């Protein structure tokens, strides 16, 4: 495949045919998903570079096929593979090689209509050379190797680039132009590779497979994130408490614990949450929706995490064990509360007397001493009492009657 990245205008006239490779329908079927993705990406990049460098020609039929998501095949006729993997500077050599092969009477590799082992190996070689050419032209193109002088300056933001092609791509950010449209849903993209990644949503194609568990992904970035699970690596650390996370978004969610930020508010009652998933579960409270049902007892829950926690009551599973004493718990929250026994941490403090507790429930019980009530319980009591109930009856509904003290209880006569 012609893996050519045109970063400056060539000294000789160049057509799209000079930097493209065609497949027959038979040959296209022999390529695996990774090779097809590489081919599409390079062809679209070649076309966009030629256009950006000022070459005027009508859109090639091959590009129209790729943008529509069709296969790039042509009629089953022999054609030259010698151009694959070469740069613009090798154009003369490519034509000479082509002419020599044509007149020597030998069949070209890759022109095997039956798709034999020799032909398939040749095609793989072409794709491999294409991938290598892509890397070579990126690393040692006309603007020099990595670390070369950044001579191409963006006039709008002042950012500099070592390649003119990178500057051209960067300018699209300022213009807001999105020239690549999805033929199925019409969504627009700034880069051709972004369109190719998006089209996998429609096709269901997942070319990136995890070598350890075989799980597949539509994007290489998602595969890289997934592989962190197998490595056990947790590269994202919280600056406040040092807790480590596998994903950057998990660290962002955790940081809200320290900042107290709750950006997700319920439009019905105004209650706010630090996670969008918690808001979704909460909204089911208003609708009375409980979509997650236990298969053993038919009990239903608002969230899948609640269902999983409940199912452990049937299985007896307690996967969260304390490292200090070995005590195990069904849920992570139970383990977190238990750890405070060892650490002595008491994060729940009474606003009236300053006494602290390891559990929120114990704080609520203690606040009854001061006559305080939980806001949620008070609101429930007002609803039960009905509108306009402000007398002693509402107070009785809000709190249960106090238990008599031991000293006030009459002693029972002993039985003899």
Curated annotation (Swiss-Prot):
Domain of life from the UniProt record: Eukaryota
Keyword Transcription regulation: yes
Recorded GO CC terms: nucleus
Molecular function (Gene Ontology), one example: RNA polymerase II cis-regulatory region sequence-specific DNA binding
Main localization (coarse): nucleus
Residue ranges, compositional bias (Low complexity): 394-416
Subcellular location: Nucleus
Ranges of residues in domain KRAB: 14-85
GO biological process: regulation of transcription by RNA polymerase II
Zinc finger (C2H2-type) boundaries: 152-174, 180-202, 208-230, 236-258, 264-286, 292-314, 320-342, 348-370
Gene3D superfamilies, A to Z: 6.10.140.140, Classic Zinc Finger
Residue ranges, annotated region (Disordered): 86-125, 368-416
SMART domains referenced in this protein's UniProt entry, alphabetically: KRAB, ZnF_C2H2
Alphabetically ordered keywords of this record: DNA-binding, Metal-binding, Nucleus, Repeat, Transcription, Transcription regulation, Zinc, Zinc-finger
Record function comment: KRAB domain-containing zinc-finger protein that represses B1/Alu SINE transposable elements and modulates the transcription of nearby genes in a tissue-specific manner. It regulates glucose homeostasis and lipid metabolism by modulating the expression of the endocrine cell-defining transcription factor, MAFB, in pancreatic islets and, the fat metabolism regulator, ACACB, in adipose tissue and muscle.
PANTHER family membership: ZINC FINGER PROTEIN, ZINC FINGER PROTEIN 487-RELATED
Family, per entry: Belongs to the krueppel C2H2-type zinc-finger protein family.
Record protein name field: Zinc finger protein 92 homolog
